[in-house]
Amino acid sequence: IVYGINHKGMDVEETDIFSAASCTTNAISPVLKVIEDNLGVVKGHIETVHAYTNDQNLLDNMHKKPRRGRSAAINMVITSTGAGKAVTKVIPSLKDKLTANAVRVPTPNGSLAIMNLTVSKGTSVDEVNNCLRKSALEGDLINQINYNINEELVSNDIIGNTCCAVFDSNATIVSPDKKNIVLYVWYDNEFGYTKQVIRLAKYVAQVRRLIYY
């Protein structure tokens, strides 16, 4: 379940275990939802540049995934990610359209998803950015997508962001034939993801904040 996208489709009363997916799945799903709804995704690849995690070794040692056995704090490590498959459970129309991989890097927090997508409708940088800007400002994804215009944006800047996806609008690329787009989405893989888990937990527990204005 990615809160903001498919949480309303679950039966809270009849479900015993809820999965809030992963930090990467929560980061890419809102943006992919916007692109799929507005431009149509034909196929694509997702590469996540991810802060190292406690699944890796601090010193070279044994690991069931050999590369993850190498020292996390001094190496860039190519590894797998389940986000490419998980996102198709959140957005079923993307099934069999995406591949995904990861590079773990020696930063303690702050990650980046790079999405290279072929779309069915010809587009432009302005159109892509406008679609995501609108979704970040109105609708069901205002707590999920942060539309960022900072030209100096780097990974440290997004730490502590409450949105699960920080869209880097200045990095958007569209190919000359207008059918291939590259999107850069930052995310705080700790705090930003935790906020999504809390949103889902509140929904399941039927905790509501009443706002009067």
Describe every region a protein language model picked out:
Residues 40-181:
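C-terminal substrate-binding/catalytic lobe of Rossmann-fold NAD(P)-dependent oxidoreductases
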Residues 159-213:
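NAD(P)-dependent Rossmann-like dehydrogenase/reductase catalytic/cofactor-binding core
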Residues 30, 127, 195-196:
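Generic recognition of short, well-ordered alpha-helical segments
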Residues 23, 79, 120, 188-189:
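Structured loop/turn residues at secondary-structure junctions
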Residues 33, 89, 133, 199-202:
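Generic alpha-helical structural context detector
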Residues 1-69, 175-177, 199-200, 208-211:
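N-terminal Rossmann-like NAD(P) cofactor-binding subdomain of oxidoreductases
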Residues 26, 122-123, 191-192:
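A generic structural signal for alpha-helix starts
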